[in-house]
Amino acid sequence: KINAIKKAITLNKPDPEDAIDVLAKVGGLDIAGMAGVFLGGAVYGIPVVMDGFISCVSALIAMRICPTARDYILASHVSKEPAAHLILENIGKEAIIHADMCLGEGTGAVALFPILDLAAAVYHSMSTFDDIHVEQYEELK
């Protein structure tokens, strides 16, 4: 994989400062399509879950095209692909799940949804201290 990427970069000479040029010269339709999904999430204010190495690459492309796309991207898990850690670090995202997975087929995203459901339930349904009559903290003297 590494040699194929090095060869593609050498032959096609993408401009690293131009995400569209990189995508056109060394990307694939899968990466372009997923980058479009991440951009669409930003346009319509809908969060999109990033899962696995290829979607990390797609998210990186989307963020280079439109930096505010970052605000709508959730990182499901850290892929075992060594470059996945670098991409997450580069885009400033922390994955929610750290389970050493490399299963494919969107497994990390599928594992994330029950966690998101739980977080939403806590956020919307949890009682406040006032609701359950917990007194305000007072320092002991």
Language-model features and meaning:
Residues 1-141:
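N-terminal loops that bind phosphate or other acidic moieties
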